[in-house]
Amino acid sequence: MNDYLEIIDVVARQILDSRCFPTVEVEVYLEDGTIGRAAVPSGASTGMYEAVELRDGDKDKYLGKGVLTAVQNVNDTIAEALIGCNVFDQPYIDKMLIELDGTDNKGKLGANAILGVSLAVANAAANALGLSLYKYVGGVNAKVLPVPMMNIINGGSHADNSVDLQEFMIMPVGATSFTEALRMCAEVYHTLKNTLKDKGYATGLGDEGGFAPNLKSNAEAIDVIIEAITKAGYKAGEDMFIAIDAASSEYYKDGKYVLENEGKTLTSAEMVDFFEDWVNKYPIISIEDGMAEEDWDGWKLLNERLGKKVQLVGDDLFVTNTERLEKGIEIGAANSILIKLNQIGTLTETLNAIEMANRAGYTAVISHRSGETEDTTISDLVVAVNAGQIKTGAPARSERVAKYNQLLRIEEELEDVAEYRGKKAFFNIKK
């Protein structure tokens, strides 16, 4: 096997994401004619500690959301540095990209520029070897298909409705394969649509393909999902569990949690009580961002109260950053990390965060963003690292479905080697 292959060109362009905003797409060209391509996602609710997504700010073009500066940074500064590099030396290339930027948050060149290059390099290397990306990144032991954390009711900043919490999801832990898991979720999704219609609710979709009805309360979202699970022929708490992304930083104001649509203002302790009541009442297996990104004491209390029986996922809390994750591990905040490639900006840093989480006994959930493209890198990544869980929206809208379809292909390719762990993917809780 050739272990040296030069990069001969790097080309970026501005494309559109699923929310009709510009994003960066990068192609890396190799001396043997191989091409690797990657497109960068973008978030709606973003943590304050995320790596910087560079936007042009020109109000006359795409309402200031253009990314031509990031594109130019790739085509000029980054391309000049990468041409002649060995495509198989991913850690070196990622280190060089970080040093080329020179800032703590990738604010000079833009995390959207840097990530596009980092992922395109990995795709080019895999293509040159004739390997699937998951095999190139994960090696011979990459075999675990993920339990989907499927968003079927959207609220918060992902929808224009009366629901405070951002995402209500289903997790088909009772399935025996990813193929079966996807079918189960699709059946519940269609059943939920009919259930909402029967109740007189609208069935318009949010950013991630979930329904966005104006429900009477946050709890009604769970009630109607459980009803749909039952009508679809499954048992909530056995075949399917509920997962929530509270996105609490979005309604954390002056040290309090303001649930405007319910007319409640809660302290950190009261917010923990709120979730504990729900966990005791409903078959909830995972809560993401239950507390705000700066409420470390609240996170610690939440973990003390619920961390043995519910997965507590830090998204805005950790932003795929090893420094923040290390602090969380030290003080006992959360027991899981959400992994978003564009929060940190390179493949190598992402893999480092997953490794740190695993060493600490934390689960890792590989995630999309609300602004997505047809790029399926995260589908390969979740199998490469055997994470066992993926969060990539509803089984609707092609930018979400593309990820699920890629996982179907991977499961087919792995054949009998493929593992679907179901409830065992939650290895650090008792449920």
Swiss-Prot record:
Entry-linked HAMAP family: Enolase
Protein name as catalogued: Enolase
GO terms assigned for molecular function: magnesium ion binding; phosphopyruvate hydratase activity
Residues at the active site: 208, 340
InterPro entries: Enolase, Enolase-like_C_sf, Enolase-like_N, Enolase_C, Enolase_CS, Enolase_N
Function: Catalyzes the reversible conversion of 2-phosphoglycerate (2-PG) into phosphoenolpyruvate (PEP). It is essential for the degradation of carbohydrates via glycolysis.
First-tier enzyme category under EC: lyase
Cofactor: Mg(2+)
Subcellular location: Cytoplasm; Secreted; Cell surface
GO biological process, one term: glycolytic process
